[in-house]
């Protein structure tokens, strides 16, 4: 999230998707920006939010909660052979959450006229070079793209990652213009000793076997060497 309004909008998406998907969700945003500036925004009406709540999921959540009236165990110890299977089995629920998040983004878009997606594209429709990034840095990148495309005739674009986990490779590929030849990935973290940072490695894996497989890929620690 970049601006106060986006924090509020996507905060609603995170809460609604958590209820429907039965999984906790981490909603992160630029805390410095939102706490050091004033913006006029139209706040959500609770009745509008109430219309989008899955009340059957809320009821099921309350029934699953620890309660002495209907006791059950949670977090029981397991042997390695069964724990491994259960950890793999739960991955399905995480993958399904991506569709739930996209569904609530669409509902929010319909109500307030926004265009939130798991991956939003900004820039020239026929861009040859794009950046993949997340967070408040996208605001600066957008301004730079506008200037360079208008003043210097470049064809640049930006893919903004709004949903990082679960990472939907197909949604990323859909967001990239078919004319793309070079991709630079800006990560939010540094992992010394790793072949690459998390977002970069996700992008590499997502593009494998697609029309963008031969695109030049760059990351912050390999600016002078295509990978």
Predicted regions and their residues:
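Short acidic, glycine/serine/threonine-rich loops at helix termini
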Residues: 9-12, 36-43, 142-144, 170-171, ...
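Phosphate/diphosphate-binding loops
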Residues: 194-205, 216-220
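A general structural motif
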Residues: 100-116, 133-141, 162-168
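Redox- and metal-dependent alpha/beta enzyme cores, enriched for Fe-S-associated oxidoreductases
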Residues: 126-151, 167-172
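Single conserved hydrophobic/aromatic residue that forms the stacking wall/gate
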Residues: 1-2, 218-227
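Conformationally flexible catalytic loops at phosphate/diphosphate-handling active centers
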Residues: 25-120
């Amino acid at each position: 999230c970049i601006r106060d309004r986006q924090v509020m909008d996507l905060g609603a998406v995170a809460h609604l998707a958590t209820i429907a998907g039965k999984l906790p969700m981490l909603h992160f945003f630029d805390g410095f920006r939102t706490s050091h500036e004033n913006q006029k925004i139209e706040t959500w009406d609770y009745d509008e939010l109430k219309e989008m709540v899955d009340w059957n999921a809320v009821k099921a959540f309350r029934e699953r909660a620890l309660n002495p009236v209907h006791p059950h165990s949670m977090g029981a110890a397991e042997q390695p052979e069964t724990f491994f299977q259960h950890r793999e089995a739960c991955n399905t629920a995480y993958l399904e959450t991506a569709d739930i998040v996209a569904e609530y983004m669409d509902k929010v878009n319909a109500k307030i006229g926004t265009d939130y997606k798991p991956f939003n594209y900004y820039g020239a429709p026929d861009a040859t070079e794009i950046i993949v990034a997340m967070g408040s840095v996208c605001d600066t990148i957008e301004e730079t793209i506008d200037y360079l495309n208008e003043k210097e005739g470049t064809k640049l674009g930006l893919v903004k990652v709004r949903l990082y986990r679960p990472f939907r490779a197909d949604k990323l590929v859909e967001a990239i213009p078919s004319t793309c030849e070079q991709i630079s990935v800006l990560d939010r973290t540094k992992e010394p000793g790793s072949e690459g940072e998390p977002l970069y490695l996700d992008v590499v894996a997502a593009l494998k076997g697609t029309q963008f497989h031969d695109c030049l890929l760059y990351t912050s620690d390999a600016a002078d060497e295509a990978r």
